[in-house]
Amino acid sequence: VESQIKYGWECNYYALGDLVDIINQVTEEEIDAKMKEYTDKYTMKTDRIDSVREQAKYEVGLEKFLSANGIGAFADTFQDLHGLKQLPGIAAQNLMGKGIGFGPEGDYKISALSAVLMKMSEGKEGATGFIEDYTYDLTPGQELELASHMLEVPPAFAATKPEIDVLPLG
């Protein structure tokens, strides 16, 4: 409530089923158009094109949902995938590239902050974005820093053409 009072931010909950209804209305033509964007933007390093097409469907539907509701930032969570086969990782990547804030695991504060940072850095490619990173090996001399297990890494962070590689979890 305080962030709404101080900054005018609203933190609304929408049932995932409402988004799924929109995603299920996405046409094959819309998916094909999004896939064309993907093949222009990414190197396809997978034979699992059905999984990538599912991501394209999610991106089209999510963008429609956000636009229709005037939403400038969003979060998702592993615990709430009702009606979805996967998390919308590529959608999150590309929507961040369009200035939409993102936060993982339902973290509305990070999604709002990332939206503000993206607004501040408009016109400066790769200036900001979100990556859920961590350091998980603290063995002296073998420290591993800036590892990420999430799919939402913005393509703007890449030094070369980013790749789509679909790998099984586990």
Describe the role of every protein-language-model region:
Residues 2-7, 46, 54-170:
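Anaerobic metallocofactor- and corrinoid-dependent redox/one-carbon enzyme cores
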Residues 1-68:
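Internal metal/ion-chelating core segments
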